[in-house]
């Protein structure tokens, strides 16, 4: 390794840059100014150092987990030292400083002084007022038709004269507020489906407090998914199946529910639940053997540390959780952002997705421990050892058609990990690999620029294909994947009928409900 590093350094001094194209894959070095001397050598030297430490971090005798952890922290240190982060070594910043006669540097210094003095960033503190829930975001008309201790269930009003009989039930992750699926009117997935003639129900998780410390994964399954399904069945009519969709951990919970409902004996305590017609899983993992960088922070010692943190307060706070996600994506969420704020004077312009991301939620202590231990640490769902009501469930019992979406730059649910459902169940799977990341790749409405996706269908009980092989063979499409999904849902639905003008049952208030508005000062 040392010999190769020396050789690369000599080549760099001679103007030879092996793998020149690699720089184009790193957004920090895409600007044409990085091609000029001496910045091209700084860039190449940094790439050589990255390659060296990727290999040097491998220590014989270490477990795979600790080996990956060592590489991760080496990557973090290198990311901090990248030439793009510093005034004297970033040609884009230097050019900007000259063109603006230093005014952007002065503005950046003011931004830095504001941050270090502890004065809240006005761009962040103004988000709740700029993007008000129910006024600017989460505005799709509807009614709250059910409420318990843990959830509210929203039924959106029809926007077409006729609708498909089978409703679509949307289950977001409990880690964040549901309105990621109902952002602004132009990019609301719920509004889009309603506009295409679907009856849509949305699950809204309550933001827990210390009194919820003992809530379990089974509680989230029963009071969340099962109770909501029962209400949907009552309102839709006897014998009408449901298209169920889950996003992130909501999708993981949906697969648990589907497997439990399909096993012999079903789920105790549930009344006349409707059957599931199809499953849609968005950035949802079911096999956690390779969960990406998030898995680096999940082992016995880390879970013990988290348990100590949550034991006293009864929950994991939204601030604690948000810090972990920032650390995972430090290049874009920390260093590149700070470079633009402090060296170029550019504060990020607020948008609806930023407002949603800042609207954090808590997780009950016991449930948080159970989901980390059973899913991430023991990978119980993939090994058919996850227990519901003291009996195991197996994903091999799922036979409904599945529409599954992974995203290319997802650091929370890596697409290759999402793809592993192919070897866990024999159902027909339509797999979509969308451009973008965990959130932006999912909220990819028609008309959004620079969007594309690949897709292919694995027939029921079809042969296994490795992810890389799939990516080489799957057809590429320009634009949003939403229309393809909607067409898939429509094809699996009965012909449209006249929409009901009134919601069956008692209305508990207008959408988006009460639970989504609960915030805590943390």
Region roles according to the model:
Residues 1-150, 163-164, 201, 270, ...:
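Amphipathic, low-complexity, repeat-rich surface-exposed segments
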Residues 57-106, 234, 238-239, 253, ...:
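Alpha/beta-hydrolase-fold enzymes
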Residues 163-174:
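Short beta-strand element of the alpha/beta-hydrolase
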Residues 182-200:
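Short amphipathic alpha-helix adjacent to the substrate-entry channel of hydrolases
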Residues 212-236:
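Alpha/beta-hydrolase active-site loop
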Residues 246-250, 254:
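Gly/Ala-rich beta-loop-alpha elbow adjacent to hydrolase catalytic centers
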Residues 398, 404-406, 410:
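Short beta-strand/loop motif that positions the catalytic acidic residue
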Residues 414-424, 435:
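Short alpha-helix in the alpha/beta-hydrolase fold that links the catalytic acid
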């Amino acid at each position: 390794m040392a010999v190769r590093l020396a050789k690369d350094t000599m080549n760099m001094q001679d103007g030879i840059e092996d793998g020149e194209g690699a720089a184009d894959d790193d957004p920090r070095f895409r600007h044409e100014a990085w091609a000029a001397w001496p910045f091209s050598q700084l860039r190449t030297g940094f790439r050589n150092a990255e390659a060296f430490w990727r290999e040097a971090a491998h220590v014989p005798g270490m477990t795979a987990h600790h080996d990956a952890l060592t590489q991760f922290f080496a990557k973090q240190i290198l990311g901090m030292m990248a030439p793009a982060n510093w005034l004297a070594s970033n040609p884009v910043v230097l050019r900007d400083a000259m063109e603006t006669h230093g005014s952007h540097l002065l503005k950046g210094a003011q931004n830095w002084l504001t941050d270090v003095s502890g004065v809240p960033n006005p761009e962040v503190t103004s988000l709740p007022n700029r993007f008000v829930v129910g006024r600017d975001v989460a505005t799709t008309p509807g009614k709250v038709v059910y409420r318990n201790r843990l959830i509210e269930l929203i039924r959106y009003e029809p926007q077409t004269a006729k609708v498909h009989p089978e409703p679509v039930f949307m289950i977001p992750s409990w880690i964040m507020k549901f309105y990621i699926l109902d952002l602004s009117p132009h990019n609301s997935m719920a509004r889009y489906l309603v506009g295409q003639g679907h009856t849509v129900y949305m699950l809204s998780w309550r933001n827990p407090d210390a009194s919820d410390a003992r809530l379990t994964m089974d509680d989230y399954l029963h009071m969340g998914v099962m109770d909501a399904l029962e209400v949907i069945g009552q309102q839709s009519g006897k014998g009408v199946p449901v298209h169920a969709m889950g996003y992130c951990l909501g999708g993981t919970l949906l697969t648990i529910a589907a497997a439990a409902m399909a096993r012999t004996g079903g789920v105790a305590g549930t009344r006349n639940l409707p059957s599931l017609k199809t499953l849609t899983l968005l950035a949802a993992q079911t096999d956690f053997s390779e969960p990406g960088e998030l898995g680096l922070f999940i082992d016995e010692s880390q879970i013990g540390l988290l348990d100590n943190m949550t034991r006293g307060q009864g929950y994991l706070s939204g601030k604690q959780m948000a810090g972990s996600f920032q650390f995972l994506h430090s290049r874009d969420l920390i260093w590149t952002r700070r470079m633009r704020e402090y060296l170029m004077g550019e504060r990020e312009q607020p948008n609806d997705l930023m407002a949603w991301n800042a609207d954090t939620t808590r997780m009950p202590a016991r449930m948080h421990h159970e989901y980390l231990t059973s899913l991430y640490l023991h990978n119980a769902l993939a090994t058919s050892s996850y227990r519901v009501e003291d009996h195991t469930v197996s994903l091999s019992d799922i036979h409904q058609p599945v529409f599954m979406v992974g995203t290319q730059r997802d650091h929370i649910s890596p697409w290759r990990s999402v793809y592993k459902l192919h070897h866990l169940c024999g159902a027909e799977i339509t797999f979509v690999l969308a451009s973008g990341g965990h959130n932006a790749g999912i909220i990819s409405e028609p008309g959004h620029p620079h969007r594309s996706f690949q897709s292919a269908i694995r027939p029921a009980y079809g042969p296994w294909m490795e992810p890389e092989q799939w990516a080489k063979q799957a057809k590429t499409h320009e634009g949003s994947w939403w229309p393809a999904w909607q067409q898939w849902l429509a094809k699996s639905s009965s012909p449209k009928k006249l929409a009901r003008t009134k919601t069956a049952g008692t209305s508990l208030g207008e959408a988006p409900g009460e639970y989504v508005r609960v915030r805590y000062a943390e």
